[in-house]
Amino acid sequence: AAEHILPGVSSVIDIGGQDMKYLRIRNHAVDSISVNEACSSGCGSFLQTFAQTMGTTVQGFAHLALESDHPVDLGTRCTVFMNSSVKQAQKEGASVRDISAGLSYSVVRNALYKVIKLKSPDDLGPSVVVQGGTFLNDAVLRAFELLTGRQVVRPGIAGLMGAYGAALTARMHDSGQGESSLVHLEDLADFHVDTTRKTCRLCQNHCQMTISTFSNGTRHVSGNRCERGASLERIPKKSELPNMFDWKYKRIFGYRRLTEHKAFRGDIGIPRVLNMYENYPFWFTLLSTLGFRVMLSPRSNHALFEKGMESIPSENVCYPAKLVHGHIEALLDKGIRTVFYPCVSYEQRLISGADNCFNCPVVATYPEVIRNNLERLNDPDVTFISPFINLSNRDYLPRRLCEVFARWNISEEEMTAALEEAWKEDAALKQEVRDKGAENIEWMRQHNVRGIVLAGRPYHLDPEINHGIPELIVGLGMGALTEDSVCDGRLERPLRVRDQWAYHSRLYEAAARVGDEPDLEMVQLNSFGCGVDAITADQVQEILEGRGDVHTVLKIDEISNLGAARIRLRSLDAAIEERGNVERESQTVDTTGHIHERTAFTRQMREAGWQILVPQMAPFQFSLLVPVLHRAGLNVRLLERTSPETLETGLKYVNNDACYPALVVIGQLIDEFVAGRADPDRTAVAITQTGGMCRATNYASLLRKGLRDAGFEQVPVIAA
């Protein structure tokens, strides 16, 4: 539709009532698609709700915004936080027109910085179409023009462009034969619909479906999470299309525990959570060999989540972590009195070129959260075993585990023998996963089927966490593969980021494999609250785009509505079809495009008196540090204060899922060059690193990327 209205269109931005879409056009075909990753925050319904709160209509709200002299800066965060910002602005005396204008800016900033991730207006290309019902709001249109500094085309039917495009497509494919299936005017007089409700029993989700039967006998199903429910028929459980999520889940948890009389050391419970989706085969084999009967917690479901809600200390933690509470409760409800849930700081180092093999802070330490928040663990009859374990150091494990299980008097020789069996099973499973991946790829190649590598963490295997997205992919006629089934060590390093998390190292490897395979695409799963993905998502995108591929991210949490996921997957499928493998294979592929040369701060620069910019990170300590650095002969300038402009720069050049301090600190540094207060050819920047599993270790990589995107890649970054 946009191409028909503006031939040669380069970008299409669509903001509707519930979602945002950005289409980049190249050679008259969709080159990439970006959709808001999850909720409808910052879309048309967002403005409508605020207009009603202010006692006016959307049209009246927009008219007031156009009269504003001082729009309020309300940020681009979640609607919940925006509500707080609006209330604060009202307390400070802001007028309705200024609040309305501020909200219009927020909607556009949300689209530009979170969805499009715009670094420069030039990235939009010469011809831009804006559409969707939200752009019928003149205030939103004007905010877009002011923020991008360019005029755009808004069709008069902006809210109906989807229908217009569908009509154009129908006309293009019309053979001139047959009759339209649209309801005739005379049939509308007899139109009626009967509504019934039914529970789908095709999987454990048990969706509550609404079935609408129309007067002509056709039916429409709503409320279903996947295509199986829409069919109203029992589809065979075993599809020919590969679904490695289903296969791997059953393989990992398919072990048979010892019988009671063989388990001479008794029962021990293990929760089916987080890194157990990676390590359960290892721990099961170890404990079974030692004579324990391993009792696994049940499959996750929403009722299990609700069982543990009272002990969840933070609403901001990711859903996979929230589920842990319910799993521990379920084990205790079964009468298990010994629960083993270790804190694994380091995983095995499986990727030789990776910088480290940490687990993320949540995965590594969540047993401590459980210990300190689950009151039932204070029962003297309950033993909760949560030692800190380093799986990358095999030599120390026998002695360490003997200490952990001291009450069972296990000798170091017995523990060593059991560990050998555990390592064998762990290696066998990992090889089996790779073999299964190769088998599935070969099958898809022979049957001309496209595959989606649904990449995330091991715990995204959990159907309660992935909400049936693998089945949705299979329902669209594509195979669903896991990232560890396709990572084969072909990625060239070093990466821009510090590659320090074990699960993400193979995520990067899988991205390289996907980029090299014309029949594979990648969809990255991201759980709400995962701060690490602010680092990984950009790196995966660089790897894929360097190989001419599309990067798609799906954000998921405890809400099981898959509407946004379904839109994104279908959009991806349509974009791939339109682009075609022929074009992809003809593209120039840069397998090293993700590798960037780093500019070093040299002795010559220091002797020449180069300025070093330091952000304000700790006022008391830095007030002492800067004079010390001056005494050492370094020309250091401390950036004392932040401003709305520095935050705006941070939003523009840093992934908006990064923590607020990262946006402020990095925005502060880059803004010095953007505003012309620092010479990029005689200035370096300095930033600290934690050196641990926290994402703060990657502040330096975020800074390097931001400087490069802003056009200052020659600036040295000093990180320590």
List PLM regions with ranges.
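Acidic-glycine-rich active-site phosphate/pyrophosphate-binding loop
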Residues: I15-R26, R77-K87, T134-G149
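A mobile "lid/hinge" subdomain adjacent to the ATP/sugar-phosphate binding pocket shared
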Residues: A65-D98
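Phosphate-binding/catalytic loop of phosphoryl-transfer enzymes
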Residues: A1-G60, K91
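Conserved phosphate-binding catalytic cores of ATP/NTP-utilizing and phosphoryl-transfer enzymes
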Residues: A1-I13, K21-H28, K119, A163-D174, ...
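Phosphate/ATP-binding catalytic cores across multiple sugar-kinase/actin-like superfamilies
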Residues: I99-D123
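Glycine-rich phosphate-binding loops at beta-strand->alpha-helix junctions
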Residues: S106, K119-E145, A158-G159, N275-Y277, ...
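An N-terminal assembly and electron-transfer interface module characteristic of large anaerobic redox
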Residues: H28, C39-L47, M54, I157, ...
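Active-site nucleophile and cofactor-binding loops and adjacent substrate-binding regions
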Residues: A1, I13-G17, S34-G42, S100-Y105, ...
